[in-house]
Amino acid sequence: MDSMPRPERHAESLLDICHEAGSTPMEMTVSQTENLTLQSISSSEDFDLEDDFSPFILAREGAAPRGENWPRRTEGVEIIVTFPPDPLQEASQEDLKESNQVTSEHQEREQVHPVSPPDDAEMVGLTGRMLTTQPSLLKTDGSSEELCGVDVALSPPRPCLDSSLAASAAGEVAPCVLKEQQRQSDEFPTSDISYSSRRTGLPLPPLSCLPMRSCIFNMEKSPKSPRHRERKVPSLSLSVPKLLEPLSRPLSQSAEFSSSKNHQEVTQEGPVEHTLRGSNCTLWSRNMCSFRKSGKQGVAESWPSQEMEGWDKTKTSGFKEGPSLFSCESVKEDTTPTERERDSGYHVSEMQRGGEDSQYLSSRKKESWTARVVERDSGVEHPILCKLLEVSNSEMTPAEEKEIGNENVPDAKSNSVHKSGAMEPHAASEEVSVPKNGPSVNSDGPAEELEGHRDIEQNRKIPMEEETNPEMNGVVPLTHIAFPGEGTSKGPARAEPHLQRRKRPAQNSNSFNLLAHREHDKLQTNTHRTKLDSRTKARNRAPPNLMVSIQASIKPNMHKNSIKTQVFPALELIDHRPHPSSKFQRRAPLTEKKSTHQTQKPKKQAFPRIGKHAGIKKPGIPLSAETTDPRLHFLDLKYSDMFKEINSASNGPGIYEMFGTPVYCHIREAERHDHRCYREIRTAPSGRCVVNKCQSSESDRCSNSRARLLQKRQHIKPPKPLHGLRQKHRGFISKDKGCKDMGGHTEDSVSEPDGQMKSPGNDFLSSKDDAQLMHLIPIPELSPEQKAPAPVSDLSIVEEIFTEECADEEGILNDDSLTQSLGDLKEPEGLHPQAPLVPSENSWAVLSEKRSGKRVSPEKHNVEPLDKINAEQMFPGYLEFDSLSEKSKTLVSFSSCSFQENLERAPSPTEQHWARSLEQDSLENNSTTYQTFGKISQEILDPGKNEELTDELLGCLVEELLALDEKDNNSCQIMTNEADAKNLNLVFSRRGNTIEELGRETTDVKLQRCINGFRIYDEENFLTSNEKKTLSDKSLNHEEAIFWTKGEILGRGAYGTVYCGLTSLGQLIAVKQVALDTSDKLATEKEYRKLQEEVDLLKALKHVNIVAYLGTCLEENTLSIFMEFVPGGSISSIINRFGPLPEMVFCKYTRQILQGVAYLHDNCVVHRDIKGNNVMLMPTGIIKLIDFGCAKRLAWAGLNGTHSDMLKSMRGTPYWMAPEVINESGYGRKSDIWSIGCTVFEMATGKPPLASMDRMAAMFYIGAHRGLMPPLPARFSEPAADFVRLCLTRDQHERPSALQLLKHSFLKRSQ
């Protein structure tokens, strides 16, 4: 909307209050117009915290631009506004009589009685509701709260109003749930009022019986729009919560106010085509409050249309402290029932002005209002809801909630928005938001069809600026406003009893909620909207017994009202408690008090975000009125967020304490028990958890950013604590320290030096976190001797996740944490109870090479005879050996020279991992390390973060390490003296399976080498000198532990998978792992025995063309064979990469293959599986034969000796199998010659013989003794073809041997 020129100020400003406090009511010149009565009620307290209540100015043309300085009034003023006359309809006496009934009843909580209209005039429906806290919801010493109604009626014109009638109704507010709606508005130029999805409410000052004054306002008829003759009288009715059945009241329409006239009677400039729009209409009064129209649908009531002429009588009753909700109803010309919309308030912030004696409403533009649906035949119906809401200690709960889902976006005619400006001293802006509260109970079915016609309301943020130039905004007729002020009420007697019930002191605040409601014409609905309505109706039924507690406290200040954590669960986003359903939940973010004066344009999306995990709200007991709800909005961070007001007083400064104090802890503990049941657990988008109550002060950010609706999952996923998190302060707040202001926009939880977790800026603190924090706050600091690990169930969220993190990343620990649960380590365990980690399955874990450049090795602690030392004591649960049976006994032998030469120790507790480095010259089998405090311990005990705790733990660790080292040295000395290296050769068994002692006399020493938890057995006599050097002589002599890391897969075979590994010595190795079938114990033992024989055979093979064997390891049911790594890959891979090989190349390769096979045959070893995949190529061109284990297994034809087992074992190799192997006619050395011929054919052509056949077909072809094998292509030389023909001789007895083939002419070319 374009900016409009600023109109002049006129004395005809709406709601002008007489300048003399004691003067009689002013009577203005009354033309032939209607007068609207307005009444002001004063209070004994100041309306403003800073200045006198500014009188209102009567708006009329030609008046002075500024009003005089009037003294403060001590009595109320009744204001009568006149409107141009219009044809009125006649009201039936029956309706008048029914509408004049006034009921005043006191109700106990959760009981609601309808309130009848007053009996003096046609009740247009203004009834105010004072919502106050109930004893069941608030911890107050007052009795049950009352609902004080204020009835305002329109009566025939008269010069001055008399306060003869007042309608009041007492009713306790029943627990209901208010529903919120975000509203949208367009941006308008500077110094205009900006709207956003926020609001700020201030509690009302005390109200009492106040004197009344009345004056008449004349609103001149606007000549700019004479064609608009429709008038509308907004009817105000008592908005009683939990009205589950409609209140039937007769209502007649006296006039329909023309929207264009309404605007132009107040402002002289602006567009002519202003029409009322149900969703954006706003009333503006001189106290800087806007009266918005809300197109909300609520309890529909049947109001017979009646005609009413002249003036309507307005009357107000006494107030009780608490928010007053005024719901306005629309009047229709015809007899169709109209909708009574209720519980929809526009919370308008109170404007205070310092140093000025008068307040002016400034506006930059007029608003173009459009009647959405119902302006077409029977006139515009605009329900107006005036809601006077007190923030302090109030419970506002509508009976049912309406869904915004079936509201239709206004069309082009109804898209205009209302823009206006206001002012506030000291550049402190207060913002407003418009909640939507529409109960879904309708008395008339046709009225329900109008739900689809509701326009989308928009949240408005109204920063109040210093402005003294009054400009009138386009308004609809203002019906009634109650202003708290000073003095005593002179109202009728029946209103006074309700005022006498008021016992608690009120707090300084002036807050108004005024909403404009629209009445929809049921005749305008179409089929589509009816369908939408019917679908919406089924979803918009909320439980009537839902309850929301409100907590608020106000800090008085000299210049402004400091809002302390005002919480309106049904109106704001701040309420973290569960909500009935995501469908019913619409929340508008809280307005931040510190937001700057700037226009904000919200999104086009009018529907607020819906919580994904909304739960049923359960009633809870909130804290007292003085208690500040510590659950803060992430955009509402201010001084009061860090300090809690202890003694709240209406005057004078308050006493505050920080949140971390015992007082806060006590309050939080109480609140945790009281509110645990209805708090909603929210989650943030990146699955992150808030573990701290502290949130950063983000006033600069929230002034420029729109509040976002964030919800947490119901099951909190704790964040990963970072390395800086201390053990002592992990997950809880120290009680002697308050929360810090944490700035920044961290996306992940980060830890502060004090151990607190900083949460992302958009996260809310969930109730689950609150409970955890409350559980942790009172915990005193534990000394290292007292910090015994608690059970997992007692740990906080942070501790539990930290434990999981540590166990997963660092691979540590068991329940006994620091030391292994060995017989002699129980004393060290008692000395180290401060281990913070919880049980994992493995007792020990090795710090991998990525985390530590040093290796750790086990330590022996028992000094017992060698024949009674069990494997667990000798190798205590280290590297997956933790599950060794305690009953298993193994004989242990160590070389005396090995131990004696390597007994020196260098315990260095100050090292990073409290582990000694592995020197190749030192024997590390008898040294244990406290890997419990490995890298994790260093991270937890970082001296920069907790020096005292680190020093204590370091001291304890030093003492324990020294004691254990001394003990271990003695143990090793004794064991060394008792060991006999000539007789004992031992192997540690897995899971208590003892390996038989090698009884034969031999100089071979079974060397246990730990390679990634696997034991490698090396026999010294089979290793050549070069290989000994490669594997390090010291490792053979001193049994050095070697670790390896598994890498990528090099290949897969029928019997296992080959991996590339990197040892701790920096060597690349090939590790073949074969899985053993453990289902049959006998078969497994037999298979293992055969594999052991095969391994023993392979260890004897030392040839340049045979891959070097390094060792084996049996881990559970997996056998690992460690071999020399050949980086060039297999011949098959070379063929795949480069194609068929040239004759000279494969001739050279064939010669080396034959040399290796000849070596095998000389040692009575038959490979039986020579093929391209089992022939490896070194980068230097050296050929290596591999996979001897599979060849040996093929000779046995499977464990059971059946053909099926053989076929299974032969999968993938039938093209290279000799006929005798397939026929199982007997194995011999000549079978390898057949395989060599097939391999040469593969190198020459790229594929083995019979590759065009299926595997099974090829096997039958080869074994049938009928078909001839294909020869080499003609492009190869004759010697090459003859060599292949000889190798593929079907009769194995006629086949040449390897030595004979080495003399073949084909191989002579390669020499």
Curated annotation (Swiss-Prot):
- InterPro entries linked to this entry: Kinase-like_dom_sf (IPR011009), Prot_kinase_dom (IPR000719), Protein_kinase_ATP_BS (IPR017441), Ser/Thr_kinase_AS (IPR008271)
Q: Which residues form the Protein kinase domain?
A: 1044-1307
Task: Spell out the SMART domains in the cross-references.
Answer: S_TKc
Alphabetical keyword list? ATP-binding, Kinase, Nucleotide-binding, Serine/threonine-protein kinase, Transferase
Matches recorded under Pfam families: Pkinase
Record-annotated active site: 1169 (proton acceptor)
Q: Where is the composition biased (Basic and acidic residues)?
A: 262-274, 330-345, 450-464, 734-748
**Biased-composition ranges for Polar residues?**
250-261
Q: Which GO molecular function entries does the Swiss-Prot or TrEMBL record give? A: ATP binding; MAP kinase kinase kinase activity; protein serine kinase activity
Ranges where the record places region Disordered? 85-119, 250-274, 330-363, 396-472, 486-508, 576-607, 734-767
- The answer to keyword Manganese applying to this record is no
Where, by residue number, does the polypeptide cross the bilayer? none
Q: Which reaction does it catalyse?
A: L-seryl-[protein] + ATP = O-phospho-L-seryl-[protein] + ADP + H(+); L-threonyl-[protein] + ATP = O-phospho-L-threonyl-[protein] + ADP + H(+)
What EC designation does it have? 2.7.11.1
What positions does the entry give for ATP binding?
A: 1050-1058, 1072
Q: Which family does the UniProt entry place this protein in?
A: Belongs to the protein kinase superfamily. STE Ser/Thr protein kinase family. STE20 subfamily.
Protein name as annotated:
Mitogen-activated protein kinase kinase kinase 19
